[in-house]
């Protein structure tokens, strides 16, 4: 494991913890897209179906369990425990416009036409666009809480660091996964506008807002 992957994993974990603490401490999921969190839960579920059939390392298995557990916990908090605070009126992105094309693409473009491989590919494609309902929700409400922007920043940073991880692995291990790289680039591009606003506004103590 190289420093970029480890740093990326830590940023990903930090983003998840920030989100869970934000919801739990405020006893509210206001400003959080439940649809994005459902998509992330779907991502981890379809990606880690090999949890009980293959073992790479204790670290790898532990992170899989943590990601899945936190994803399910987040969905539970939004749609059950703090359901009364969920802003469904603004969380209106049509997720079928993401899931259906991604499902079709994963069947057509994959490394191996087997159920587990197709589902893994589906998770890679879906993760690249899963944040869109959250960004759409922010654009509709006009602004986002500072703690929510921190969550998004670490989530975007995780993906950017993984791009460097792939460059490292190609340079030193000869590893090249075009599907993961293209999906990662797409995901990072989606965060570019947010990164700019985060640096120019949030870090200067201003509220973040996305253009409607």
Swiss-Prot record:
One of its GO terms (molecular function) is KDEL sequence binding. Pfam families: ER_lumen_recept (PF00810). The chain crosses the membrane at residues 5-24, 33-52, 59-79, 93-110, 117-135, 150-168, 179-199. It is found in: Endoplasmic reticulum membrane; Golgi apparatus membrane; Cytoplasmic vesicle, COPI-coated vesicle membrane. Residues 47-48, 159-169 are annotated as: Interaction with the K-D-E-L motif on target proteins. It is a multi-pass membrane protein. Residues 1-4, 53-58, 111-116, 169-178 are lumenal. Keywords: Cytoplasmic vesicle, Endoplasmic reticulum, ER-Golgi transport, Golgi apparatus, Membrane, Protein transport, Receptor, Transmembrane, Transmembrane helix, Transport. Belongs to the ERD2 family. This is ER lumen protein-retaining receptor 2.
């Amino acid at each position: 494991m190289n420093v970029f992957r480890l740093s990326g994993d830590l940023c990903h974990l930090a983003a998840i913890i920030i989100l869970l603490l934000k919801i739990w401490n405020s006893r509210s999921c206001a400003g959080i897209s439940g649809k994005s969190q459902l998509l992330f839960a779907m991502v981890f579920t379809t990606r880690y179906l090999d949890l009980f059939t293959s073992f790479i390392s204790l670290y790898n298995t532990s992170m899989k369990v943590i990601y899945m557990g936190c994803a399910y916990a987040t969905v539970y908090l939004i749609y059950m425990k703090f359901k009364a605070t969920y802003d469904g009126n603004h969380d209106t992105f049509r997720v079928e416009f993401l899931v259906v094309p991604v499902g079709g693409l994963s069947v057509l473009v994959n490394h191996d036409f087997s159920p587990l491989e197709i589902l893994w590919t589906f998770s890679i494609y879906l993760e690249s666009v899963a944040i869109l309902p959250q960004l759409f929700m922010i654009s509709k409400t006009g602004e986002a809480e500072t703690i929510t922007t921190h969550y998004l920043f670490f989530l975007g940073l995780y993906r950017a660091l993984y791009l460097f991880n792939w460059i490292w692995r190609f340079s030193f291990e000869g590893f090249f996964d075009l599907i993961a790289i293209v999906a990662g680039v797409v995901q990072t591009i989606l965060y570019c506008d947010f990164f700019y606003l985060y640096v120019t506004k949030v870090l200067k103590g201003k509220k973040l807002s996305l253009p409607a």
